[in-house]
Amino acid sequence: MGKHLHDHPDVVQVLDAPELKDLFGLSLSGMAQTLRGIVEWRKHRTGMLTTNFAEAGGFIKSDPSEPAPDLQLHFVIGKLVDHGRKTVFGHGYSAHVCLLQPKSRGAVTLTSRDPMALPLVDPNFLADPDDMARMVRGFKRTREILMQPALAKFGAKELAASASARTDAEIEQFIRQYADTIYHPVGTCRMGPGPLDVVDAELRVHGLAGLRVVDASIMPRIVSGNTNAPTVMIAEKAVDLLRAAP
């Protein structure tokens, strides 16, 4: 239990686009626009605040020889730095690339006998060289997309942190510094019949009576996409299992 932790490692390129004031941004005009948006949403449930912020995305191959897409892209209508924890003024947009089937595995371990103590979470991102190689290719593919005429016409400029990464070695250094979770952790209570597996096919913990695990941690391997819908499915299946239990 607690082993086999994995997630979709994600890295973002943030672009400054001062002229795109219809996007979310910290500025006088942006604040006024947001206030108008709040009023519109409260009155009509329409307008800019109905956005999910990640308004576009897609699945691509890091290399044409891949049998299936191994990268997922998210396009955000604002300058999102450090999950929004860092204040960035002005208007712009962000492009995320995340690895769908990472080989690296981390772990969650206890730090004490106190059940209220926070555990130690080691995501161990990019420990496998193949993960980094795919992320570097994905970073470069994302930059190519951002340079296409449909976006280039807005004159956006990458923020310095990523703009200075030009060679593969520099891109790798940028990724190691800035790659982070996209909130899709799975695997620490994985399903299976083996000695290192935690639950069986009915979500029951091996060796313990009356205990089941019902969340994304039971996934033996992460899905190639967002984990929300599969986790809902796991919960719905658990309901059926509990109703059928004697």
Q: How would you name each of these model-derived features?
A:
Residues 1-89, 144-149, 169, 173-177, ...:
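Mid-to-C-terminal "cap/lid" subdomains and adjacent gly/pro-rich loops that border
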Residues 1-20, 63, 93-151, 172-246:
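C-terminal structured subdomain/cap of oxidoreductase catalytic cores
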Residues 152-163:
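Short, glycine/acidic-rich hinge or "gate" loops at secondary-structure transitions
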